[in-house]
A protein has these predicted regions:
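Anionic group-binding determinants
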Residues: 1-163
């Protein structure tokens, strides 16, 4: 579904684009002219804050997983079912729901799981405890993005045992 751009609004900076749109400028420092966007910023920040609070993440961790929180919360926000048509926002825009949006199979942000990493001897650990922060893009629905608190890195894996 592609539509031709009719109008492009920006601050009075005068950037020169080759798209040949009809230009409309807004004044600087006037949030009343872009109220919907300002409200959306607050909504996204509130979602991210609520998700991190529910996962008991401190401020240092929140900064590290902020991008994951935003991607996950935006995707979840678009899965809201429309009251009148019983369709998700994805379906209303002519798109398919994400592969991971299967009822009953979705994981909770901040959920703990052990990512298996092979054997380390007979008595060694066979996995690393990590935290779920989202779903991997361009993979099967059961491929997860897991955050390792020890190394502070995000790993994609489908070998997860949920705690």
């Amino acid at each position: 579904m592609q539509e031709k751009m009719k109008k492009l609004m920006e601050r009075a900076a005068g950037a020169d684009w080759k798209l040949n749109p009809k230009w409309e400028f807004t004044a600087c420092s006037t949030p009343q002219q872009n109220g919907l966007v300002e409200v959306e910023f607050a909504t996204i920040a509130g979602r991210a804050r609520a998700m991190c609070n529910a996962a008991h993440m401190n401020d240092k961790i929140r900064i590290l997983v902020a991008n994951e929180v935003l991607m996950y919360s935006n995707a979840l926000g678009n899965l809201v079912v429309d009251k009148d048509q019983s369709q998700t926002h994805y379906q209303l825009m002519g798109l398919q729901n994400p592969k991971w949006a299967i009822p009953g199979a979705m994981r909770t942000f901040g959920e703990a799981g052990v990512v298996t990493c092979g054997k380390h001897g007979k008595l060694g650990d066979r996995g690393i405890p990590m935290v779920f922060v989202g779903y991997a893009e361009n993979h099967f629905h059961y491929c997860y993005r897991m955050w390792n608190p020890a190394s502070r890195q995000i790993t994609e894996s489908h070998d997860v045992i949920w705690i």
